[in-house]
Swiss-Prot record:
Enzyme Commission number(s) from the entry: 2.5.1.75
GO biological process, one term: tRNA modification
Name the UniProt record assigns to this protein: tRNA dimethylallyltransferase
Sites marked Interaction with substrate tRNA: T107, R129
Organism: Polaromonas sp. (strain JS666 / ATCC BAA-500)
Catalytic activity: adenosine(37) in tRNA + dimethylallyl diphosphate = N(6)-dimethylallyladenosine(37) in tRNA + diphosphate
Record function comment: Catalyzes the transfer of a dimethylallyl group onto the adenine at position 37 in tRNAs that read codons beginning with uridine, leading to the formation of N6-(dimethylallyl)adenosine (i(6)A).
Family to which the UniProt record says this protein belongs: Belongs to the IPP transferase family.
Keywords for this protein: ATP-binding, Magnesium, Nucleotide-binding, Transferase, tRNA processing
Sequence positions that bind substrate: T18, A19, S20, G21, K22, T23
Region Interaction with substrate tRNA: start-end pairs: 41-44, 165-169, 253-258
Subunit structure: Monomer.
Amino acid sequence: MNEVKSVGAKYIALTGPTASGKTAAAMAIAQQHDVEIISVDSALVYRGMDIGTAKPTVDELAAVPHHLINIRDPLQAYSAAEFVADAQRLIDDIAARGKLPLLVGGTMLYFKALFYGLDDMPKADPAVRAELASEAAAKGWPALHAELATVDPVTAARLAPHDSQRISRALEVFRVSGQPLSFFHQQNAAKTIADDGREERTEILISLEPQERSWLHHRIAERFDAMLAAGFVEEVKTLRARGDLTPDLPSMRCVGYRQAWELLDAQEARSPGGSFPMDELRDKGIIATRQLAKRQVTWLRSMPQRQIITCDTDQALPLVLQAVAQHIEKSSR
């Protein structure tokens, strides 16, 4: 299952942790090559979530054709399986029109699903998820984390007691299948085929990765400050005011949105109409974004076929453009 799959046409994939400069690099590639961009970002699919997702600007969207952005209402889910189907269709369509598909984003699960296929584990069960959400509301997520530790200690050991999304999925898998989530991960790992010796691929995965974490942390803080200045809290207030969204939805679990929603709830309970704790949101949002970046880097290390470009140097963009040009020349021979 983990042998890299052909998706029909050659393409270029550009990834890296959040705030590593993927959008700027993609736009630079687009200036030199006739590309269409396919977003590989589970947050950018949602309409009305522009500021907190660092969505490409109106000018950027107009300058280069983009796909898989603004395709879902925040009330809807969008799975890795749906992404793979959409991405494969778009790759073939873009290539058929004589253009180069450029996949850009940091949702590593999507990349892994596209490259290697999906894990052979149980599908989501809405009834079980609702049951778990009800139990969590009554007992709290730490209690469900403790339950997980009894049936799947391997998975529980790597999850925080309040990691609701992952605790819910792990317990859901166990209740549906009778097997722990770690069992399916082990089965998948056993099928992994080493990259060495694979046939030459017609795709390339470029990964922007910093040498110094402090550089990335500074960029994350700068970007979150810019989001706050651009009206991120008002964006979350607008989403909450719809009345049909809840903090348990995948859209509202996105980094930044979850923290803002929780603080807005706390403010209303404590002092309706009082001042919003902007400094607290800044701290929580930056910490959560750093944690996201750390998880993304961990995912990247499981993709040995990637071509690493050090992004915290002045040569990052020239090196990306060079790698793209060399790959296009090589694959056209």
